Amino acid sequence: MKIEERDGLARIAKFETPHGPIETPTVLPVINPNIMNITPQEMKPLGLQGIITNSYIILRTPELRERALREGLHSLIGYDGPIMTDSGTFQSYVYGSIEFNNREVVDFQRRIGSDISTILDVFTTPGTPKPEAEKAVIETYNRMLEVNDEEGIIAGPVQGGVYPDLRQKSAELMNSTNAGYHPIGGVVPLLETYDYSTLVDIIINSKINLSFNKPVHLFGGGHPMFFAFSVYLGVDLFDSASYIKYAKDDRLIYPDGTRDLARITELPQWSPLYDRYTVKEIRDLDKERRSLEIARHNLKAIFMEISEIKERIYEEGLAQYVAQKARSHPSLMKAYSRIMSYSNILEKYEDLSKKTAYFFYDSFSTRNPYVSRINRFTESYLSSNKKDTYAFTYRAWNPGYTNSEFVRDVYQKIDCNALISWSGTFVPAELENTYPIEQTVSSGFEPDPDFSRAKDLIAPFRVDMYKGEKFEGEQVRSFNLNKIRMVADYQFGSGVGRMIFRDDVRINVSKTGRIRGILSKEGRQIATMRNDGFFTLTYYGASLIHSQLKPPAMRVTVSKESAEYNAKGYSVFFKFILGSDENIIAKNDVLVVDEDDVLAAVGKAMVSGRELREYTEGIAVKVHEGRDQSEK
């Protein structure tokens, strides 16, 4: 996978197949080789990049089998792009068994020229008992081992029923094989019953235990209603037969659900049928023609949702889109609640900050991954600082607004830990300008009017609520100095603030009071402060951290060959990375070092610490200053 854009676990990426690249996220429409209602060529203008067809149907149909072996799969289907083949697993689930074994099915897919072949895995249903589901996981793994030496891209499905630990086990087993593509199987019954919350457990326990360098496919997840949620959790591809199945039942797909033809009065303007038919005219078509036209509408709805999701990823606003869609159906809201229960996991893959503002809707917003990140830091901060602590509500201190008088008359006259209320929690006051604290757009809904929930966070610590007291005397501390140290601790790790910002640093402040840059006493630039409230380090600033933080903290280790180029200011490519700090946050500054821990450059990591070690193509760190540039 070559990553192009990312938004947490969601990504726009490309992977190569023998018949060209596929850019994800996308949908592979299911093509029935016996009945080609709409050809792949007709689908191309909608955004088609590949299709999926069933090798079992071809194998068991003599005419199709002979033609596929003679002319090849692509000639049979009439499509020159990437084709994935399924193995017949779902048919074995529906009909009880099929007449071919795993090796025969995979070998046939290879012989007819499938771009992505799938093993004959063992399907498990939501009702499958756990011991039986575990046997299916082991058998599916063994079947992958049977064909582990096959050439080409082999899809190794993740099974495990509704049991998160079995999904984890299956993912880890498949990840240890040569499978180059990972479908998540056995989920169609859950999709059909709108059991999206269970599906959340399945997806996330599969995704985080698979390599980030391989595509993840949600088998049978062909309705756009759940696309955004799935992509948010790291799914790259879907397949869809729903466009034609629903059409045969006179059901029209919309991004937010499905509607019966008998119950609609108007067609949406985006529908390809809008300027060609009235609803009555569609109803009056003969059955075959009507199904075909509705299928075209359904395909448009499916690809339109994929386009919207990709745009949200570019904007770094997919989380907002998911939050909005969650409120369109109770089953989606239940799924969203389940997603938020995984915030501590999701937070590891979220960027340091985003292009878009943080939208605060209601109490669900207090469970956002960014809130989890800040809460964890706040708890650590209070645990390590044994001073008295004051908590200031938004009535006294409002993030994003000038609080100069309050800073002068209160903060700088008492030596204490200062917390401010924000989005249903308490955060250190010094982080007031960092993302997402300042960059919040609030609904005005106060989920915790008496701050009882926020107080739970600080309950283990001795905290006094500020009641409007006035403090006399001289200034005992500098807010700006404490601010830059606190931001550095939050951004780079506890204790870093004092490492790089001594008492005698010079802090440049704009006319509006915002910090712009920090210099050493001698006038050397240490860092600049960005619009999101975080720092961009200079090479000199990075060297101060490097000299005091032990490896692997903040490090991306590269080969000596790469380090020479990085020292000149060139970016780091994934293929040259030898190791990285597991705790690196995407879009945060990192130290680029060689095998001997010699600092070569400082730059912005494009992905998280784990991802830095797993991707093999593209830019991993955008260097903004190398050693050679600094020395000039």
Swiss-Prot record:
Gene3D superfamilies given in the database record: ArcTGT, C2 domain, PUA domain, Queuine tRNA-ribosyltransferase-like
Keyword presence, Hydrolase: no
Family: Belongs to the archaeosine tRNA-ribosyltransferase family.
Catalysed transformations (reactions): guanosine(15) in tRNA + 7-cyano-7-deazaguanine = 7-cyano-7-carbaguanosine(15) in tRNA + guanine
PROSITE patterns on file: PUA
Annotated EC: 2.4.2.48
Protein name: tRNA-guanine(15) transglycosylase
Cofactor list: Zn(2+)
UniProt KW keywords: Glycosyltransferase, Metal-binding, Transferase, tRNA processing, Zinc
